[in-house]
Amino acid sequence: MIKEKLRYTKTGKRIESYEFDAKLHQKVVMDKFQFENHILVKHPEITLEIIKKVLEDPDIVTKQSKSKKEHFYQKKINNLNYFVVISQNPSIRKLRFVVTAFMAKDTNFLKEKNKYIRYKTK
C-alpha cells in the first residue's frame, strides 16, 4: 500500500508526499511535486505502483561508491528494467528520498558506475 502523507519542513512549509517501504531502508519518501513535475513528465511509463514494486522487491540494489549516499534499486518487470534512485538527506536520519525513477532496456550503462552491490536476489 502506498501511503499519502503530509510532511512539514523546519520552516513550517507543508509538503504532500508518498511514503514507501524499501528492502534496505525503513522509510522512503517522494514528494508529490517531484512525481508529478519530474518523473511523470520525463518518464511517463513510471507509475506509483512500479516505484512501490521496485523498492519493496528489487532484483538488485547498487551504489556508485561506499561514500555515496545514492542507492539504485533495480527490478525487471515484463522484460523492461526499472530503476528507482534514492538518496539520504543529511539533516534527516533514517529517511530516504526518491530522486528519480526511470525505465531502461539495457542495464549495462550502470555497470561501470555502480560497482558496490548492496543486495541481490538469490
Set out the residue ranges of the language-model regions.
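Ribonuclease/tRNase effector modules and their secretory precursors
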Residues: 1-122
